[in-house]
Regions:
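An acidic/histidine-cluster motif and surrounding catalytic segment
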Residues: 1-104, 108-252
Length: 252
C-alpha cells in the first residue's frame, strides 16, 4: 500500500513548533496529500515520558548503552526522551490507522507527492536529509526507486507500515525506553529494521531555530540552529546512487 497520510509531530505548548508544523502541513497540502497532527510529549523526565506512552525504563540497559553508543547520555535528556516518546505515539497511530503513514517532525518540508510507491513491510523508508532552507533542493521527479542504505541522519521524515510499527513497539516494550529515537531508527539502527532511502528524496528538514530551548532542565551544550549535514566538516551519510536524484551540492 502507498502512504495514506502524514503524521506531523507538533509541540502544542510551543509557538515556534506550531509555526513550523503549519509550514509542514501546508507543504503536504500543496503536494495533494493529507496530514494530521500528533500531540508531542513535552516537559517530562525519562520515567514519566516512558509511562505516558506505556513504556518502562530499564536503567541497567541504559547504563550499558551509555558505554557503547557515542553520545548516548544525551538520549536521556528531557528534550530527546520526549521526542522519542512522541515518535512512539506516532507508531501507535500508524497501527490505529491500519495503513502506511509518513511520520514528519514539525520542521519537515514535503517537496513532492510521494504516494506513487508501495511502502514495504519491515523497512524504514527515509524520505530526505537536512538542508539549509526550503529552496536549496528541488527533486527532479517523484520517487523512482528505493535504495538500501546503512544509516541516515535525522528522524524528521520517514514512512512505515502498521506491521513495521507493531514490530518496533513490541521491541520497545521489551527493552524499554532507553534509546534516543535518532539512534534507534537511523544513526545506529538499533531497531535492526532495514533502511531504504527514497530516490530522489521527496522531503527535507530545513535549518531553523530549535524549539528545545524551553525545556525545563539545565543542559550543558549548544541549543539552536543545527545544519551539520551541510557542513563540509561533517561527513554526509549518503549513497552515490542518490546524488543524481538530489540535484544539488552535498558534502560527502
Amino acid at each position: 500500500m502507498t502512504v495514506d497520510r502524514c503524521l506531523i509531530i507538533r509541540r502544542d505548548s510551543n509557538t515556534l513548533s506550531q509555526e513550523y508544523a503549519k509550514i509542514c502541513a501546508d507543504s503536504v497540502e500543496r503536494c495533494n496529500m493529507k496530514s494530521e497532527y500528533i500531540k508531542a510529549v513535552e516537559n517530562l523526565g525519562v520515567e514519566d515520558a516512558a509511562a505516558s506512552v506505556g513504556m518502562k525504563v530499564d536503567w541497567e540497559m541504559a547504563e550499558i548503552l551509555e558505554n557503547t553508543i557515542t553520545d548516548h547520555k544525551e538520549c536521556q535528556e528531557m528534550g530527546n526522551v520526549c521526542c522519542t516518546a512522541s515518535h512512539i505515539k506516532a507508531f501507535r497511530r500508524v497501527v490505529e490507522i491500519g495503513k502506511p503513514c509518513a511520520i514528519l517532525e514539525h520542521d519537515a518540508y514535503v517537496m513532492r507527492n510521494f504516494r506513487n510507491f508501495e511502502v514495504p513491510d519491515n523497512y524504514l523508508v527515509f524520505l530526505g536529509p537536512r538542508m539549509r532552507d526550503t529552496k536549496t533542493y528541488v527533486p527532479r521527479s517523484r520517487v523512482r526507486r528505493l535504495i538500501p542504505v546503512q544509516q541516515a541522519i535525522g528522524t524528521h521524515a520517514y514512512a512505515i507500515t502498521p506491521e513495521t510499527a507493531k514490530g518496533m513497539l513490541k521491541h520497545l516494550e521489551e527493552v524499554g525506553l532507553v534509546y534516543g529515537i535518532d539512534h534507534y531508527l537511523f544513526m545506529n539502527n538499533e531497531s535492526k529494521v532495514p533502511i531504504i532511502a527514497a530516490d530522489p528524496y521527496p522531503a527535507i528538514c530545513w535549518t531553523r531555530k530549535s524549539t528545545m530551548n524551553d525545556v525545563k532542565e539545565e543542559v550543558d551544550g549548544p541549543r539552536g540552529v543545527w545544519g551539520g549535514q551541510n557542513d563540509k566538516n561533517v561527513l554526509g551519510i549518503t549513497t552515490p546512487g542518490l546524488l543524481e536524484g538530489l540535484g544539488c551540492p552535498i558534502y560527502v
